[in-house]
A protein has these predicted regions:
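Hydrophobic alpha-helical segments at protein termini of multi-pass membrane proteins
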Residues: 1-262
Length: 262
C-alpha cells in the first residue's frame, strides 16, 4: 500500500500542529487533549448541520459574490459551528466547570475541525495544491472566527458583580445576557468571515492580474498564486487580534477570582 507522505503531512500535519498549539498555549487545567479532539470531531460533524441549513433554508438572497459571502456562506457556517460548540460545552460542563478561556479554545477547536473537513472538500474538487494555501489561510482564519464566538460566550458567562455589566445590554437584560452576548459573537464572527472571504476573492484576482503582467519576476512557484501575500498578511492580523481576546479572557478570569475572594 503506497502512501503519499507529502499529501498526508499537508493534510494532517498542519492540522495536528494547530491542535497542539491550542493545547499547549492554554493555561493549566483549562482543557485536555481529549476534549480538544472531541471538539474537532464535533467541528467535522458541523458540516452535516451546514448541509441541513441549505436543505431546509434555501438561499433567498439575490446572487452576487458579496451577498453570497456576507449573507449566505458566512452566517450559515458560523451558526453550524456554534451549534456543535454548544453541544460540546454542554457535554464537558456535565463533568466539570469550564474556565472562560476554555470556551474560546473549544470554539477554536470546533472551527479547526470544520476547516479540516472543508479542506477535504476542496482537495477532492481542486487537487492537492490547494492544501498548502488553505493550511496557512482557511484553518487559522476559521479558528479566529470561532475564537470570536467563544470569547463573547465566555464573557456572557462572567456574570458576577461588575462582570454582569461588561456592556450596557448585560445590565438591562440580565436573564438573557448569555443569549445576547452569543448573538453578538455570532454577528461579529459572521461579519469578519464574510469580509475575509470577499476580500481574498477580490484582491487575489487583482494580484493574479498583476502577476500575469510580470511573468519573469513572478515565475517562481511561491508567487504563482495571488492568495499568498494577502493571506499571510491577513492571518498575521487575525492572530494578533486573537491574542488580544485570549489575554483579555485570562485577565477577566483573574479579576473575577480576586472579586470572589473579596
Amino acid at each position: 500500500m503506497n502512501i503519499d507522505l507529502g499529501l498526508f503531512i499537508s493534510f494532517f500535519g498542519i492540522f495536528f500542529f494547530y491542535s497542539l498549539i491550542l493545547y499547549f498555549a492554554a493555561p493549566r487545567k483549562t482543557i485536555t487533549l481529549k476534549e480538544i479532539y472531541i471538539s474537532i470531531l464535533a467541528g467535522i460533524a458541523s458540516i452535516s448541520v451546514l448541509q441541513f441549513t441549505y436543505a431546509f433554508l434555501p438561499n433567498q438572497v439575490t446572487y452576487n459574490e458579496f451577498n453570497e459571502f456576507m449573507y449566505v456562506v458566512a452566517p450559515r457556517e458560523e451558526l453550524s459551528k456554534f451549534i456543535m460548540f454548544l453541544l460540546v460545552t454542554t457535554w464537558i460542563s456535565k463533568k466539570r466547570k469550564i474556565k472562560p478561556v476554555g470556551y474560546m479554545i473549544i470554539s477554536c477547536a470546533v472551527a479547526l475541525g470544520f476547516a479540516l473537513e472543508e479542506n477535504m472538500h476542496y482537495y477532492l474538487k481542486y487537487g492537492e495544491h490547494v492544501l498548502s494555501v488553505r493550511n496557512v489561510s482557511a484553518m487559522p482564519a476559521h479558528m479566529f472566527f470561532g475564537g470570536i464566538i467563544g470569547y463573547w460566550y465566555a464573557v456572557g458567562k462572567l456574570n458576577i458583580g461588575k462582570f454582569g455589566g461588561r456592556i450596557n445590554l448585560g445590565q438591562w437584560f440580565v436573564k438573557s445576557r448569555l443569549t445576547i452576548y452569543s448573538t453578538i459573537g455570532l454577528f461579529c464572527a459572521s461579519l469578519m468571515h464574510g469580509i475575509w472571504n470577499y476580500s481574498l476573492s477580490f484582491y487575489s484576482k487583482m494580484i493574479n492580474a498583476i502577476m500575469d503582467s510580470i511573468p519573469k519576476v513572478m515565475a517562481l512557484p511561491v508567487f504563482n498564486n495571488g492568495w499568498l501575500p494577502i493571506t499571510l498578511f491577513a492571518v498575521f492580523i487575525l492572530l494578533f487580534l486573537m491574542r488580544i481576546l485570549y489575554r483579555d479572557l485570562i485577565r477577566l478570569e483573574k479579576e473575577k477570582q480576586d472579586y470572589i475572594k473579596e
